Design a protein with these regions (language model features):
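Surface-exposed interaction/gating patches
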Residues: 1-16, 110-176, 182-184
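Short, structured active-site "lid" loops
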Residues: 50-66, 173-180
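Short, conserved beta-strand segments within well-ordered enzyme catalytic domains
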Residues: 8, 32, 59
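Intrinsic disorder/low-complexity detector
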Residues: 1-14, 63, 68-72, 76-79, ...
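A cross-kingdom feature marking solvent-exposed beta-strand/loop segments within repeated
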Residues: 3, 17-54, 71-85, 149-175, ...
Length: 201
């Protein structure tokens, strides 16, 4: 049985090509990327002799085994543990909406589906919906129908979208909207169903 996680990697924007190559070489062709900026105070940057720089954020779905391999490479090859290089971590997922979607996201990683897990002692959970441009209102209307509140939208670019045809039977554009919605744990499954249904058509 395999557990799945969302891997978050944050690094400087000028490292985009290096990290894209690294992920693909390590069997991770499907990921999202977006930009941000650091919030370190200027005196901290001055102390370490650093300049404020734009950040690059990568999001990918990985299995526990894939994370172990990636983590080793991130340290030995990408030097992620060197201060100022970046950070990479994983967040456990309790479920993914749809078998084919899961197959697409984990792609060629070794994976055996296990039962959905309940997050213990949590009143709220974070729903991450990935949609094509122009579908934000569709996703949010569906989420609100399941009693979810507002959401936060991040514009991102998807890599590996050509693999969608293999798993989902449709082509996906690279430009994506990532919608983050905090929902009550007991209403999470209903939100997933509401969001998944209208966005399939």
């Amino acid at each position: 049985m395999s557990k799945v996680y969302m891997m978050v990697t944050i690094t400087n924007r000028n490292k985009r090509k290096d990290f894209r190559t690294f992920f693909k070489e390590h069997g991770l062709p499907v990921f999202l990327e977006t930009t941000g900026r650091g919030t370190a105070q200027s005196e901290v940057l001055d102390y370490f002799g650093l300049e404020e720089s734009e950040k690059l954020l990568f999001l990918a779905i990985v299995t526990g085994e894939t994370w172990k391999k990636l983590r080793r490479g991130l340290i030995t090859k990408m030097m992620i543990d060197v201060p100022g290089t970046g950070v990479s971590f994983i967040v456990p997922l309790s479920s993914v909406g749809g078998r084919k979607t899961l197959q697409f996201l984990v792609n060629e990683q070794e994976f055996e589906k296990e039962e959905e897990t309940a997050m213990k002692d949590t009143d709220y959970e974070l729903l991450v919906a990935i949609a094509n441009q122009g579908y934000i209102d569709t996703v949010m209307d569906a989420a609100r129908a399941a009693k979810a509140g507002g959401g936060t939208v991040i514009h991102a670019k998807g890599t590996g979208m050509e693999l969608a045809k293999k798993y989902l039977g449709v082509s996906l554009v690279e430009e994506k909207e990532v919608i983050l919605i905090v929902t009550k744990s007991r209403e999470k499954n209903l939100s997933l169903i509401h969001i998944s249904e209208p966005t399939r058509h």
